[in-house]
Amino acid sequence: MSRYRGPRFKKIRRLGALPGLTNKKPRAGSDLRNQSRSGKKSQYRIRLEEKQKLRFHYGLTERQLLKYVRIARKAKGSTGQVLLQLLEMRLDNILFRLGMASTIPAARQLVNHRHILVNGRIVDIPSYRCKPRDIITAKDEQKSKALIQISLDSSPHEELPNHLTLHPFQYKGLVNQIIDSKWVGLKINELLVVEYYSRQT
């Protein structure tokens, strides 16, 4: 299944706010109207919608998400929390959380077009897994800095998660540590996602 490129508002109307996908928010009450039209949700549908939320927020294909679930299962600790850590430490998501890109698709474009350096080297893989002490900067070109400045200017200036530090005038972000689960940028029940895949495989 390919990455979603359709109307974004349609997705947030059904699944709720997905800040990684779009800055738009569903109108108040639209979720309640959808629920009343569709009646009581089955357990399968509840798990499916949580999985879809995760997939669309982080901009993943079905195959990519399944791969992350399998990696998380093999790691020590809670599978759900490890899964969220893996997704949050992706380079495209780190750029989004720093405010250097307005959405995760915008961050992916910055990376694909080689505007971003990690530890002084160009990285053009959006799924690159950032590590503590990584230094993320804009390429030293006017176009790269201008693109990031637009995002920084329009950023809502929310409190940065404690695993990141931003130096906006230097177009630089630092990864201080692996993200703590309480700073994850999406309201989600990750256990339902794990359950969804455990029943599929």
Swiss-Prot record:
The UniProt annotation puts the region (Disordered) at 20-44
Any one GO CC term of this protein is: chloroplast
Coiled coil located at which positions? none
The transmembrane segments are none
Q: Give GO terms: molecular function aspect only.
A: rRNA binding; structural constituent of ribosome
Domain called S4 RNA-binding: residue spans: 89-150
InterPro entries noted in UniProt: Ribosomal_uS4, Ribosomal_uS4_bac-type, Ribosomal_uS4_CS, Ribosomal_uS4_N, S4_RNA-bd, S4_RNA-bd_sf
Q: Which SMART domains match?
A: Ribosomal_S4, S4
> Could you tell me where this protein is found in the cell?
Plastid, Chloroplast
Instruction: Specify the domain of life of the species encoding this protein.
Output: Eukaryota
Keyword tags: Chloroplast, Plastid, Ribonucleoprotein, Ribosomal protein, RNA-binding, rRNA-binding
User: From its record, what is one biological process in GO terms?
Assistant: ribosomal small subunit biogenesis
Against Gene3D superfamilies, the record matches this protein to: Ribosomal Protein S4 Delta 41, Chain A, domain 1, RNA-binding S4 domain
A Pfam family:
Ribosomal_S4
What quaternary structure, including any partners, is listed in this protein's UniProt entry? Part of the 30S ribosomal subunit. Contacts protein S5. The interaction surface between S4 and S5 is involved in control of translational fidelity.
What family is it from? Belongs to the universal ribosomal protein uS4 family.
Q: State the protein's purpose.
A: One of the primary rRNA binding proteins, it binds directly to 16S rRNA where it nucleates assembly of the body of the 30S subunit.
Q: In its UniProt entry, what is this protein called?
A: Small ribosomal subunit protein uS4c
The species is Nicotiana tomentosiformis
Q: Which gene encodes it?
A: rps4
